[in-house]
């Protein structure tokens, strides 16, 4: 099973990834968007066994829905297949944009874009839950305990 960590910049994905690694979970690097065949790379990760992944093909779908650029090379059919072997944790805080700015990150340039990304995540993950039966857990590290994440994974 792959555990996909998703969420806007500043939402706590990388911190959660580090905590899960310290807890003993296998953490794998995400598949590069520059890969010519991302689907094959995801299949290799699934075949490798349980792992935590910081961002996934869902990230590409969300960000492309906001900036109107072409999405990656994974088809909807392939995505539905991959999701059978994944659980998704959406890291979500009300202050993600501000937290990102405090750290000096500049991937998201304004609050309006950050809000669009947050809304796109919620919409896309709701649709994936409904139509593919994907398991999604929303985690706000400022309000919830780490053990809630562990319970979802296990």
Stretches with model-predicted labels:
Residues 91-93, 108-112, 130-149:
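Phosphate-binding beta-loop-alpha motif at adenosine-nucleotide cofactor sites
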Residues 2:
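Walker A (P-loop) ATP-phosphate-binding motif of ABC ATPase nucleotide-binding domains
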Residues 8-11, 15-52, 59-67:
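Conserved substrate/cofactor phosphate-moiety recognition/catalytic segment
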Residues 5:
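Hydrophobic anchor at the beta1->P-loop junction of P-loop NTPases
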Residues 51-54, 91:
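Structural recognition of the conserved hydrophobic beta-strand(s) that form the central parallel beta-sheet
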Residues 67-128:
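A glycine- and Lys/Arg-enriched "phosphate-lid" helix/loop adjacent to the NTP-binding pocket
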Residues 8-11, 56-59, 94-97, 142-144:
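Short, solvent-exposed loop/turn segments at secondary-structure junctions
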Residues 44-50, 81-84, 132:
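Flexible, charged surface loops at secondary-structure boundaries
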């Amino acid at each position: 099973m792959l555990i996909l960590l998703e969420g806007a910049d500043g939402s706590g994905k990388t911190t959660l990834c580090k905590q899960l690694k310290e807890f003993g979970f296998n953490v794998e690097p995400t598949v590069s968007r520059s890969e010519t065949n991302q689907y094959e790379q995801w299949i290799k990760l699934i075949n490798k066994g349980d792992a935590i992944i910081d961002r996934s093909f869902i990230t590409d779908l969300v960000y492309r829905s906001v900036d109107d650029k072409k999405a990656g090379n994974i088809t909807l059919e392939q995505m539905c297949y991959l999701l059978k072997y994944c659980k998704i944790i959406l890291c979500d805080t009300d202050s993600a944009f501000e937290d990102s700015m405090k750290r000096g990150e500049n991937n998201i340039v304004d609050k309006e874009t950050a809000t669009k990304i947050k809304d796109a995540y919620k919409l896309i993950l709701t649709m994936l839950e409904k139509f593919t039966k994907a398991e999604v857990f929303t985690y706000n590290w400022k309000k919830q305990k780490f053990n809630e994440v562990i319970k979802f994974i296990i």
